[in-house]
């Protein structure tokens, strides 16, 4: 089992308490790692020590709704302003003005939004599996219904309690299905995760449930309604997108449109044969890509 070679502590910020894993020297440039759905800071277990050893101060929180962090009851507590505010608050906690933000899946969406909602705090931004995409012209749930129909999983996630109960009925089946690239149903564990590593996820989500995580999806429309200014806002810092060529998620988000949002230096890297959980599936390749990006950012 790979363990987190870092210090764990609780940080009070932005009205919540977050469990944060921290590695590297205080005062060094900060790299903040934001996990996705349904993950934990543990999903960065292969990146935290490598980035810290490269000379960075690494912060990897369980984001609100997950793991050892607070799980507010109100759906409104999970909007994009709260989520980006949490990450900015972690910079305040360590006395850093800026950080290089790296996110996976939903964490990537939070990172891209941090770059436009709090540009003064972002030195550079990287997203794994979810590219920077411009603001939609219509409400997300309306667009999904038109494009995918009423049975689309993100629409099913909108109903409080429904998906929560289904996923919590058998957490091991939920997580194995997710990691195998399915939305439901037990599946054999992929080779990239050990039984002990898998059990870490099962134990945590058995304790916390999935409601906090699903509330991120239930905030999609609210996020769209509260950010009309993003239609004319660009990401001006260095940006990186890393995708897996076997990931069913990334291509559906049309990474070719990234340049509509990113005005600064932009790099796109694909990991051949990798699926959605790219930083866990192919840690060595992803680490090489991330370290090269960090080096380029430091030069700029």
PLM features per residue range, with description:
Residues 8-10, 58-60, 268-270:
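Conserved beta-strand scaffold positions in the cores of enzyme catalytic domains, especially
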Residues 25-26, 94-97, 297:
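Glycine-rich phosphate-binding loop signature in dinucleotide/nucleotide-binding domains
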Residues 265-300:
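Catalytic active-site module of serine/aspartate enzymes centered on a nucleophile-bearing elbow/loop
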């Amino acid at each position: 089992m790979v363990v987190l070679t870092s210090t764990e502590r609780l940080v009070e910020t932005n009205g919540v308490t977050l469990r944060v894993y921290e590695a590297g020297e205080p005062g060094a440039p900060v790299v903040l790692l934001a996990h996705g759905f349904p993950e934990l800071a543990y999903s960065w277990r292969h990146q935290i020590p490598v980035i810290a050893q490269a000379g960075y101060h690494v912060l990897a929180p369980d984001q609100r709704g997950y793991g050892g962090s607070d799980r507010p009851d109100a759906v409104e507590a999970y909007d994009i302003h709260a989520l980006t505010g949490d990450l900015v608050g972690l910079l305040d906690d360590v006395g850093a003005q800026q950080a290089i933000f790296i996110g996976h899946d939903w964490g990537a969406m939070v990172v891209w939004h941090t770059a436009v909602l709090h540009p003064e705090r972002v030195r550079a931004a990287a997203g794994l599996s979810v590219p920077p995409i411009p603001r939609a012209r219509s409400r997300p749930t309306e667009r999904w219904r038109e494009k995918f129909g009423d049975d689309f999983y993100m629409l099913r996630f909108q109903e409080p309690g429904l998906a929560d109960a289904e996923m919590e009925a058998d957490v091991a089946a939920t997580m194995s299905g997710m990691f195998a690239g399915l939305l439901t149903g037990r599946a054999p564990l992929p080779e990239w995760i050990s039984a002990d590593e898998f059990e870490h996820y099962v134990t945590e989500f058995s304790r916390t449930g999935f409601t906090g995580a699903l509330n991120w999806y239930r905030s999609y429309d609210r996020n769209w309604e509260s950010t009309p200014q993003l239609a004319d806002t660009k990401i001006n810092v260095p940006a990186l997108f890393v995708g897996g060529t076997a990931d069913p998620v990334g291509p559906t988000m049309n990474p070719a449109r990234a340049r509509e949002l990113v005005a600064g230096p932009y790099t796109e890297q694909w990991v051949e044969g990798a699926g959605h959980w790219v930083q866990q599936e192919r840690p060595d390749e992803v680490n090489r890509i991330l370290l090269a990006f960090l080096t380029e950012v430091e030069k700029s």
